[in-house]
Amino acid sequence: ADGVRLAHASTVAKKVVMETPEEYLRKNGSYCIYARKAPCAVDTAAVRRTVEALVRQQVPFDFNFDHSSAKALYCTEFVVHVLEQNNCFCFSRLRKRNYMYPNDVLKIISTR
């Protein structure tokens, strides 16, 4: 996977990081990787800039799993936040729940 980088909210690093798939798999005891087409039109360059900014800002992992604020992000919240920052609000309805699970995102994608 030359040049491929995964961006995610890492419980190991305790912040948003970007790393190779090999680094991700080596550092994480449990993992799931979803490669799906965005369910709405997005500017991939803008999404990348948003992700790179979160990495630069060293946004911490949200161990409280509180998606009412973007001061810290957990895995699924990271995906929803990045897309919302780029005018893709298809997952925003998940914010009405106490917790947003990866499966919730997959269900929305599969119905589109």
Q: What do these predicted regions represent?
A:
Residues 10, 55, 82-83:
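Hydrophobic aliphatic residues
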Residues 52-60:
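The feature captures the short pre-catalytic strand/loop hairpin that immediately precedes
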Residues 40-42:
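Surface-exposed beta-loop interaction hotspot
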Residues 1-37, 61-73:
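Glycine-rich catalytic cores of cysteine/serine-nucleophile enzymes that process amide/ester linkages
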Residues 66-112:
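Activation targets extended, charge/polar-rich intrinsically disordered C-terminal tails
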Residues 3, 44, 104-105:
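Short linear motifs in intrinsically disordered/low-complexity regions
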